[in-house]
Amino acid sequence: MKKFVIEREKLKENARIIEKKAGVPVFAVLKADGYGFGMKQMAEILKETGIRMFAVTEPEDAQRLRDWGYTEEDILVMRSTAMADEAYQVVQANAIATVGSPEAAQCLNEVAQGCGMQAKAHVKIDTGMGRYGFLPDQYAEIKKVYTACPGIQVTGIYTHFHSSFADEAATRGQYKQLCHIISQLEADGICVGMRHAANSNGVFRYDDMMLDAVRVGSAFTGRIVNGAKYGLSRLGYLESRVIETRTVPKGHTFGYGAGYVAKDTTRVAVVPVGYTDGFSVEKKRDLFRPRDVMRYVKNDLEDGRGKGNIYISIAGHRVRVLGHVGLCHVSCDVTGLDIKNGDTAILDVNPLYLSPLVTKEYV
């Protein structure tokens, strides 16, 4: 038996810390099924803490939230789109669209007018993320969304920080570009609506960038750079159990490719968890710059992987995985420890890579 366990109180406490630090309304970002934790459950718990605004990337997720009873909450769809079917979904869900291009503005305007409605929207400025958003030098086009689209009621403006966890100069540069656009609009007599820029790391690093709201996702899970330093608890763990213990002689090998050779007589615990369950699975590393390489090296050294080591917890003991992680199993060195069959094993996994066969349990 294995399950991914999520502690409700940890999530609530993280939310309280975030809301206090922000000091302004918080958009709870629930993209990718709530970062793998379950969008429906995350929304329920965060609403209990006072969250009244949500953000998603997919138009259908906005409708799901409405269907689950979130009829009064603001829901921001953070993905700009020039596809009429997606714009229609946003309008029908009474969600807030993101407009990040002249094409997206035209599409949303036409769809909303065709529905006999006025769609709410936030204008997005691309200050360096490179995906969605008007470029800062497209001021004329940005202004038209406010003044020349009768089917759109612009209620906000925002940007997306790309390096708020590490690069202060770049982040401040992005913020400055957004503020410049806002100043231009206001100078032309336009009420820009809700202004927001700070994301999960931005909330904790830049007190002067909170504006009217913030957008927070991964910080709710405690899985951000320096999360513990900010008082956040890491949310979620994979729970399994020891199904067999055995003793092998010196020289015995472990895993495909005989990745480890026992240096002495070794007592082993077998746990039925592998990369099919998301254990030891991670996204491909981005190694575009030397500092990216150094960051991964630093992290690996801190958690033991710099020496090829992977650890899990069994009955409260930190134990080493022997050999390569298999599809469905791992063998662990429990020599000298009072560990027996049935003992609980705790493993750290990214819930985005969990097998759909693994049950999520909120406790």
What are these regions (language model features)?
Residues 3-6, 12, 175-363:
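Active-site anion/phosphate-binding pocket segments in diverse small-molecule metabolic enzymes
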Residues 2-6, 10-13, 23-196:
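Active-site-proximal beta-alpha core segment in soluble small-molecule metabolic enzymes
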